[in-house]
Regions:
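HKD-type phospholipase D/PLD-like phosphodiesterase module
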Residues: 1-21, 27-175, 186, 191, ...
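Amphipathic alpha-helical interface segments
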Residues: 273-295
């Protein structure tokens, strides 16, 4: 089931944790939500094994903030691993564990939201809650691989939209027949994505936050010269943090931004959605489009 933030709040994540019988495996770019941490603490108290993977060097966060995240997990009795080295930033290396998901063995939440107050109260985000056995197994396989520092293998790449290596699936969503609507925090610098959007022309509509970078503004100007419709959503009262693409046949929701690093180097996770989720995404997009301003 698809959930929209900030309407849903932390409830979809809490559901996964509260319904865990044996284990909770959580991987998120950053974790500071008190309701989520409290739910994890209660899970530990019920005898549930709680494992958490966090990015040790998230962009823009201070060391004390990262230490606070780690201390919170360890204080409740959870087991903490930092992301594998290949998904951690270093001098001259712009790469992150940017995934955002939680699984309990029979159910997973996968989406665009970090687990913090802002995501659940001030951001546009999308979360998908699924009991699809193939998706659950694939996500847990990725978690176990990252927990042990191994490769995830081919099966998760077939079932999920998984980075590194998610560009082909995202391009296929953009290239589907008919119009496409996109919400994203960044326009990004991936040439193939930009060219695919340009090829859509007026059949593509894009909503970005009004705070996009100068480089994003140049890319937006280029896309508009090819006919792409772009609007900017003011940062307040609601910030556009989502990463969503929807057409009439298929949709994407996940952690991936449209940058080469996000698609080809980071750890990212998303899903391809069909059926009723598409209508829900299109309805929310149309409401956001009406609120956004012309560039």
């Amino acid at each position: 089931m698809l959930y929209v933030e900030p309407q849903a709040g932390p409830a979809p994540i809490l559901q996964v944790i509260q319904q865990a019988h044996r284990s909770v495996d959580l991987n998120v770019y950053y974790l500071s939500s008190r309701p989520v941490i409290h739910a994890l603490a209660h899970a530990v108290g019920r005898g549930v094994r709680v494992r958490v993977i966090l990015d040790e060097h998230p962009y823009g966060m201070k060391p004390w903030q990262i230490r606070k995240e780690a201390d919170a997990v360890q204080a409740i009795g959870g087991r903490l691993h930092w992301a594998p080295t290949r998904f951690e930033a270093a001098p001259g290396r712009y790469v992150f564990d940017h995934a955002k998901y939680v699984c309990n063995g029979h159910e997973c939440e996968i989406g665009t939201a970090n687990f913090d107050w802002t995501a659940f109260h001030r951001n546009r985000e999308y979360l998908d809650l699924t009991r699809n056995p193939g998706v659950v197994h694939a996500a847990m396989q990725v978690f176990q691989a990252d927990w042990t520092g191994q490769g995830a293998g081919s099966t998760p790449h077939r079932i999920l939209v998984l980075s590194p290596g998610s560009d082909a699936k995202i391009l296929a969503v953009i290239d589907q027949h008919g119009p496409v609507d996109i919400e994203s925090e960044e326009m990004g610098n991936d040439r193939a994505i930009l060219d695919a959007l340009a090829a859509k022309g007026r059949s593509a509509r894009v909503i970005l936050p009004a705070s996009i970078s100068a480089q994003d503004r140049r890319n937006v100007a280029w896309l508009k010269s090819r006919g792409v419709q772009v609007r900017l959503l003011p940062k307040h009262p609601l910030y556009m943090h989502a990463k969503m693409i929807t057409g009439k046949d298929e949709a994407f929701v996940g952690s991936e931004n449209f940058s080469e690093a996000s698609l080809d180097r980071n750890r990212e996770m998303g899903l391809l959605l069909h059926g009723g989720a598409i209508g829900k995404l299109q309805e929310q997009f149309n409401r956001d489009w009406a609120r956004a301003g012309e560039t």
